[in-house]
């Protein structure tokens, strides 16, 4: 047994140094736990930060936006408005469709929200129209969240109506049962139905009306209970042929007798097998298709959900005819996996670069192996804690681990360097390990807890940004904490067993050259430091100038919210004149599709026209453009968007709005562009007055581009003005008028056909082919008192006027949303400020309110909290350092290094043309924790020299700077190289990672140069200040 020299206690490391087997087994257990934990970690693009969101859709075919608002949306909103935990309620009421989107507080569980929504729908049932075809349907999905998967179902042989029937029952229902799927929608509107198109002239000639025929059809097709017979011995169930299943059966239906002869439905109408809604259509690459969009539930694991769907697809498609093809057009998980793979590669590259730096400085394989073991062990051990906390492998947690490679190696470097120094002086490895580890233990603890203190404010950030970065902060903190444990246990134990004087002194030509280079660098630094200490006020002026410069740069740098990602999918809205019909929109989308599919970067395209829960108005179309992978195309998504908009711009009568899909979705409605701003009023009249004025003002701002509004009040409407007195005299009620109009022009669902697998509808309408437009109203006839038919024109006049195409509400008040993008050369911060200035210039009345929405609102909140976040990080670190050093002064000396990091980060971002967004701000906060390490290592050794060797402060800090120069340079370069792969990232999701790397590399480069000189000067300044205070207050000195 070795005899240990006095004082070689080893501190907290002693037990682990003296018991190598136990230490090895403990570390092996941690490694095994991490490996097992990694296998259970789900993969995602970002941490799950979705607001609990529920969408309620109510369809009422034929109803105008006014009717949908007053009869359907308003009663539902009144009930929903009473729910607790509701954050925001928005609605869209358009022709035949009402969509209410409910966004709840982040803290409310989605299941609880679902129960409240169901209760509210039940309470509103008696307030809704009695002839609603279906009750309101809710789904746990955010409509603004892009589909996780889009599938196109096409066939050259089978009609689309039959295809939808098969897909709905055999495919869509099964996919909707997959865990994590929130909603499966079939875009295309080809749901099978029997369509009855009345011939107005024929029914008028026979003295019939549409209401008579509707009543006859409804009475002829029933499916109700009939009872049973219960005899002494047998029970018999009653059944009848009360159901009609095919168009041919309806065609033969007798609807009346005239002069003793039967009048069959086929005599007065065209009866055919068709689609339930003839004003809906979808296309995949210009071919008619049923487009299946799969959306996930908020909080669901997107990778696991997509994998489950892909596994069951082969089995589901086998149940379809061979002529029916199912094609996966887009799968968001493809890019998510690619992004995660790229980040994992950057993590491995960062580890390799860090180990290379260690070898370059230590030039010794055993000494390089020790931290080379500590880095992966600390990172892998973090996985075990991540599983326990329900985290995932995503871009942010992997970024945290990549950055952590530079952090976790710092502790090991500091320990190894200190132990090596004693071994080189001639002490035995075990004694050197105990002495070096004991001496450096407090420094390791100071470094660790002061760095974790910087991350604490991130945990208390509010709303969605705080939830987003919680996994990042905790993952990084856990890795740093494990690193400290490894550095105080495994690292000194390995040093005691693997290092020796012979191994450390063994040098080759490369080692000797590096040693001479380092010696010259240290000598040059020593000469420069001596000059700086002789001219302290000049150095202090530089330090003060960096503080002022950092404030100035903070003010002028362009500010953004979240990097715009290239995920390979573009969402689009095609806008046409407000009076556009379905047929004209279908033709326009074909022209647009032709241009888009010619672009070399486009892989596939889906388009949708018509009004349903996803598309609010008939004059708009939805597009999803799927791009080729980044490896197969030369341009990024923004360049592709510009090229597509240029190609479509020459098509008359259309405006195309495009935006790339993002992993982070905060909005609750699909918008035309990236950012939204709302104008809310108490009445529609006030909204119609101010909306055009604000739109014109916003369109004139250079800070905004592609400004548009969803306020559309120039749709054409036929106003039927009934003379109530004349109608009453003839025995015609307003209900008769509404029914006649609904029967003719509402695609009215009048009956249900029940099959073994599904239910289909019978649709009633007038055949308007011979009399299109307003002329079709001349064919409407009603039944009078005497049983005769009376034309509508006898009791009503028809006028054409303008009407809103949709009526939108925000928290029950009328609202319009302005969508905009930010042109090149401006930032989101510039755009927000310009909008606020315009609002003040217009002097809006008190009953008109404005508000940013979605990511713009989150940007405002984040921008307001950023300064406080940085202040909180600095204060938290000051408190921790003050407690550790038992001093009010020394923490200030350490924190004086921070402005240099801010200057470097902000300058680097501006040079790179990057905005100061949330990711970059996180990088600056991390820099606060990194750059103070230099000061801590200097001050720790200076204080120890003053205390133990009785050195003067100037000599102590000068010696500490020279002694710690090499570990300071090593740790800074390790942190810099850990961030370098992020800065140089070019793969999928690089937009998300690059700002963090740029901020950290820039901050580290500038701070490394400046703090080596400013910290000693500031240390001596505060030392003199402390002596001055003690001289002025002798009592304090005596107490000391």
Curated annotation (Swiss-Prot):
Q: Which UniProt keywords apply?
A: Cell inner membrane, Cell membrane, Membrane, Transmembrane, Transmembrane helix, Transport
**Places the protein is found:** Cell inner membrane
Q: Which Pfam families match?
A: ACR_tran
Q: Enumerate the transmembrane spans.
A: 25-45, 347-367, 369-389, 396-416, 440-460, 472-492, 537-557, 869-889, 890-910, 911-931, 968-988, 998-1018
Tell me what topology the record assigns in the membrane: Multi-pass membrane protein
Q: Which GO terms describe its molecular function?
A: xenobiotic transmembrane transporter activity
Q: Which GO terms describe its cellular component?
A: plasma membrane
Keyword match Transmembrane helix: yes
Which Gene3D superfamilies does the record cross-reference, listed alphabetically? Multidrug efflux transporter AcrB pore domain, Multidrug efflux transporter AcrB pore domain like, Multidrug efflux transporter AcrB TolC docking domain, DN and DC subdomains, Multidrug efflux transporter AcrB transmembrane domain
Main localization category? membrane
Instruction: Report the NCBIfam families cross-referenced here.
Output: PRK10503.1, RND_permease_2
Q: Which family does it belong to?
A: Belongs to the resistance-nodulation-cell division (RND) (TC 2.A.6) family. MdtB subfamily.
- Subunit text: Part of a tripartite efflux system composed of MdtA, MdtB and MdtC. MdtB forms a heteromultimer with MdtC.
> In its UniProt entry, what is this protein called?
Multidrug resistance protein MdtB
Protein's organism: Salmonella arizonae (strain ATCC BAA-731 / CDC346-86 / RSK2980)
Name the lineage.
Answer: Bacteria, Pseudomonadati, Pseudomonadota, Gammaproteobacteria, Enterobacterales
